[in-house]
Amino acid sequence: MERVTRMVVRDRNHPSVVMWSMGNESGWGPNHAAAAAWTKEFDPTRIIHYEGAQGNPQRRGYVPLRSVGKWKTAEEDPVKGEYADLANPDDRDAVEVVSRMYPTVDELERLACDTLVRRPVLMCEYAHAMGNSVGGLGDYWRVIRRHDKLLGGHIWDWIDQGLRKADGRGGWFWAYGGDFGSRENHDANF
């Protein structure tokens, strides 16, 4: 609660704040619900989103977690035939936006067309900008422009992942992972 209340009180007058988020990839529990309720009461002018609020157990079609942070897969739930976090038709009532991370273009279109989803849909992360990426934006935006329910999304993360390091010849470069001697500290294509 304290982090959220401090953030909201501190940032409530910033014109670039268009909505509040209850966190990032930290599960869901009573503290999230309480923080969302407090935030909405303190600032009713902005909407609330949180990707951790995926799936409302009171809604038809809800697919429960099989363990912390792990959703049932298509093999475990052949009725859904897809990852359950994207298949859950709606999110908890504490949030006003259905948030999804990295949906495919087809998954985004399914959410837009799903009659059980009555709230706006936001890709809270998509088109990860690490390395040689950020492709397919045209496909996403064709779908977004077709459906009023879709808000768009936030490209993650529009920043260089490296740290400035001297190159030994008087210059510098953006170093990452194995550039610091360890071969275990890297991300996939780095």
What are these regions (language model features)?
Residues 1-189:
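Substrate-binding/catalytic cleft of secreted carbohydrate-active enzymes
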